[in-house]
Structures are given as C-alpha cells and as structure tokens.
A protein has these predicted regions:
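Positively charged n-region of N-terminal signal peptides that target proteins for export
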Residues: 1-5
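Flexible, low-complexity junctional segments that flank or bridge functional domains
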Residues: 57-247, 254-260, 275, 317, ...
C-alpha cells in the first residue's frame, strides 16, 4: 500500500486553460483561495478551512500503483470530496456508483499510461465541470462542453472597431469613450490584475460618461481578488452577494452551514454611481462567473448577453498513487438567494450577436447595452 495526500489548491479562479501543468500546485497567495471575504477576515476564514478540511490533509492509505489502484483512488477522491455529486444527480441523473461500474470494465492490467489517462479523463468528464482536471507531467484533461455547444457571442475584430486605435490600457483593462458618451471597459482575464490606483484612474476618466459598459466576455477567470475588487466599486454599502459551504465529511451531503459572502464598498476610492451594463457569454467562467453573481445584486447593474459558463466550486487537489494530480470542486458557491451557480448565471437581458449585425461590423450585445444606458439616462 502507498500513501496519498490531499492539498488545498490555489488556482480556484482559473479556467482549465490557465492551469500550470505541474505535479503539485503550491499555494503562493492564500488570499487567492478565498476572495469572497474582505482581507480583514481572511485569517479567520483560513483557519476555518484548515479545521474543516484537516481530515483531508492527513495521509491516507490508497491502493498500489496499478491501473485498478489508480482508478479506485480517483473514484474515491471524487466520491468523498467532490461537492456537486448530489446536485448533479438531481440535475441530470449523475450516478457515481454506476460510473464506477461502467469505467471499471474498461480497465486491464497491461494497459498503458496513455490508455489509463484516457479512461480516467473520460470518467471525470461525466461530472461536467470545467474546474475538474486530471494532470500528468505532459497532459491535462479538460471538459469543454460548458462552452463548445453554445454560440461564441464575441468577435474580437468587431470589438476592436469599438475600441478604436486610440483606446487606453491599464493592467488587464482596455477602455474607451464611445461617441454617444458611453464608457466602455473590456476586461478579458482576471489573471491580469489591475491595482486600486489604476482602477481609480480608469473610473475617474470615464466619470464624464452617461453610463458604463463592462465587457467580460471570454474572461475565463483568474484571480478571485479581481472579482471582489471590481465589484466593490459599484456599491456604497455592504451587500450580501452569496453563500459558501465547506465539505465536512465523506458523505455527498456533508457540508457546513452556509457562510454569507459580502462585498463592501471600496473605501476612499472612486466608486461608479451611474448605470452599468455587464456583458457576458458562455466563456465567462470561474471568477468571472463569481463577478457576475456579485453584480447581479447591484441595483444600478444590468447583465446583458448570454448565460455565463459557471464554475462555482472552490477547488482542491489530490495526488494519485502514480503521481498524477486531480483538481476538483470541493466547496459549493451559491448566489444571494442560495441558488447554485455551477452551471452558469442567466443574464437580465438575453441577447446573441446577429449575423446581420456582424456582417455590418456591429456587436449586437454592445449595441443592446448602449440602447439601454441611453434609455436610463432619459
């Protein structure tokens, strides 16, 4: 018998494409694990996580390094630690025990590592979770159907028409003032951080505008702290934006009580007081999905576009006997009404880019936002 360890993963806010393919992921910035609370309470929250997951951090015995042993280790990790098994059973009939029987039949003692990887990756894809990955030294499995089966609703060549040649860029943000005096911000990845002072500069410059478009289409996530930092510029009071539960035992429904998540107004910073339209598509995932959940409760905000890609579980990682790593969602995130956001968040105004508009170099979603903001001004 060999041993296996379960480790907290610091890459929650990232889509699979943003994962660094390493055998083990080290926590570099503890605040990136849980940005849902203010930094003042982070230390307390971190101790809560450690206490609740202490049993998962203790060395456990697992089967030997064989195809069957690695299969059993992976299946058990998901069975005891993955946080959406019961929810997905209700949503689309996921039966993890049936999955075990079906995929076990595909194992052979003499199968290659490549064949084993294929079987295990396909088993994990049954979870329909973009935050679940099997990682070797050379390969990472990915579940892509959370966006593959949907319209793109974003064309970068058309977006560049709106930005123009004289747009400004700070950190990961590009911004411009459109001809109808509507401010336009594009934030394509929360992996590209923007500092508080730079954010002040952007909002100050756009303060002359009648409304603001905040476009996060194709934002696959990144730093969760960016979700909280941006959202804090759109409220003047502490506001409840959601809840988070922690896995407390091996049962599919072993969770802590829901812990409230708040966004507090950015103190001594520029805050936006006018209407704002947040643009989304299916590629808005993970921490971008979390940002939309926060903005949903802001009274001056309207979400426009397509349903987001989801990805709301707080990920952990574990190691198999052969050294492969698995990332999985371990703690569910809910919106302010205690609804799951794992499969995405519906917009307030659902609209897709039309073929006619695209042929004319127009973005239907941006145009819808401009029309709305003009109406709100009147």
């Amino acid at each position: 018998m060999k041993t296996i360890k379960t480790n907290i993963l610091s890459l929650f806010g990232r889509s699979p494409q943003q994962l660094v393919r390493t055998k083990r992921s080290k926590v570099k910035n503890l605040e990136n694990i849980h940005p849902f609370v203010s930094s003042r309470s982070f230390a307390t929250l971190w101790m809560t996580i450690v206490i609740l997951f202490l049993p998962s951090c203790i060395t456990e015995e697992v089967p030997d390094n064989t195809p069957q042993g690695n299969f059993e280790a992976l299946w058990k990790i998901i069975d005891t630690k993955y946080c959406f098994l019961d929810y997905k059973n209700k949503e689309y009939g996921l039966d993890w025990n049936e999955i075990h029987r079906r995929y076990q039949n595909r194992l052979t003692d003499d199968m290659t590592n490549k064949q084993l990887f294929q079987v295990l990756a396909e088993m994990l894809n049954e979870l329909r979770d973009g935050h679940v990955n099997l990682m070797t030294y050379h390969e990472t499995s990915q579940y892509r159907e959370w966006y593959d089966q949907y319209p793109t609703n974003f064309v970068d060549t058309i977006q560049r028409i709106y930005l123009g040649k004289d747009y400004k860029a700070i950190g990961g943000i590009k911004y411009q003032i459109l001809e109808d005096n509507i401010g336009y911000i594009y934030y394509g990845s929360f992996s590209n951080a923007i500092g508080e002072s730079n954010l002040d500069e952007v909002l100050n410059e756009l303060s002359i505008c009648d409304g603001l478009i905040l476009d996060i289409r194709n934002n696959g996530g990144g730093l969760l702290t960016m979700s909280d930092r941006i959202a804090s510029r759109f409220t003047n009071k502490k506001v409840l934006t959601g809840y988070l539960c922690y896995k407390t035992g091996p049962g599919h429904n072993d969770f802590s009580r829901p812990e409230p998540i708040y966004v507090e107004p950015a103190t001594d910073r520029v805050r936006w007081q006018k209407p704002v339209a947040v643009l989304t598509n299916r590629h808005a995932f993970s921490s971008a999905n979390d940002f939309v959940s926060k903005m949903k409760v802001m009274p001056q905000a309207t979400i426009i576009g397509d349903k987001t890609g989801g990805g709301s579980g707080l990920p952990f990682s574990s190691e198999l006997p052969n050294g492969w790593s698995v990332r999985f969602s371990a703690s569910p995130l809910y919106d302010a009404d205690m609804n799951h956001t794992e499969f995405g968040i519906e917009p307030d105004i659902k609209v897709s880019m039309s073929t006619e508009d695209m042929s004319n170099g127009k973005d239907t979603i941006i145009e819808t936002a401009r029309k709305l903001l003009k109406e709100k001004k009147e």
